């Protein structure tokens, strides 16, 4: 039987240094080595969220890490989720349920922080009682000293957990010595003793040229460098932050089915399109350029954290009109969640759930109307797509109800296992749904691509098997470049 390991926290010198991916790697490594790991991030800020089996909401990154760990996701893995709804305001989701909107000043004030701290501590304690080890992820930089008193997620959380902290730094962006040394030295002495190792991430070139740098960092900081992990391009793990959209295709291609995702300002759950991005039959691109939209065979309207605001922008910049024109000229248009709402006759928000806009006309492609409501629907679903007999899976996360207009027939896109119906189907070129993850189902993708048979030179692939292969590749990559015996020693040391 394996020993109990201390919790392991992957903290960072800054944002986007690779904490989430390294945490996923260790979740898979511990699983491969016979442990029963689980991920944990006390507070996450992201638009990409996921519905747990209990119908509650967590950050998508922790759902991915749970998948790497081979366990079902749970709200205890991410008890506090912030979903930005504007540049200054976020929806606060506590233990999987929204508790209201807060601006940054209100959220980081000391009043109320201790109640939130108790909640995230309790979530960790429940998780630690069930799993060994807990793989924790910090947020942003560990040395934001102006926010020290209100920090719920970095060193204060590690101290509560009794975690060993590995500091992750991104050498690719430059300044790694200053960022590592500065991060360590800005910590209080009682915090600093929890830093047990440094991991240099995203290294390019010959690692032998950095051997002297490793020694310098160890001498400066007084802790070992537990690994130098090279940059990779051939491992595909779901990404958490929409900043990664900057690396995606932005133009139509040739020789494949051109699928355009409309680039909304408040786009959420862009992971809905991961399968299409890997499908060899498809050229997926993200755009709000009207000329590029006209080249698309299929246009996908994604989810939005602020549907009315995005609808206003689409009408203002001409994208709404371009989508309607493209559909009239033969393009398939499909909306998911907020995108489904956008496709209807109108979107109404009389109770100001989203903001000040009370009503806007939609694109008019679907004979439905949406009314925003304060209660959020969050659940995993099983369903049949149209009349197909295959059982599909997905999840719902939305605020608002969408209903057909009074003078049109009921024409659902999906028949849910609990007897409910979802979405609206006009014909195979025009449809909408509330189900995120609908495009993870092969039968749905095959249906969308079937009219473009002249472009289909490749075959589809098994996405679930593909993801498992990628987790194993990631684990092998990290295992090769870290001192795993040293890390196990750290996690079992009684000092």
UniProtKB/Swiss-Prot annotation:
It comes from Bacteroides fragilis (strain ATCC 25285 / DSM 2151 / CCUG 4856 / JCM 11019 / LMG 10263 / NCTC 9343 / Onslow / VPI 2553 / EN-2). Keywords: Cobalamin biosynthesis, Glutamine amidotransferase. HAMAP family: CobQ. InterPro entries: Class_I_gatase-like (IPR029062), CobQ/CobB/MinD/ParA_Nub-bd_dom (IPR002586), CobQ_GATase1 (IPR033949), CobQ_N (IPR047045), CobQ_synth (IPR004459), GATase_3 (IPR011698), P-loop_NTPase (IPR027417). Catalyzes amidations at positions B, D, E, and G on adenosylcobyrinic A,C-diamide. NH(2) groups are provided by glutamine, and one molecule of ATP is hydrogenolyzed for each amidation. Belongs to the CobB/CobQ family. CobQ subfamily. Pathway: Cofactor biosynthesis; adenosylcobalamin biosynthesis. Residues 256-444 form the GATase cobBQ-type domain. This is Cobyric acid synthase. The keyword Transcription regulation does not apply. Signal peptide: none annotated. The gene is cobQ. It holds the Pfam family CbiA. Coiled coil: none annotated.
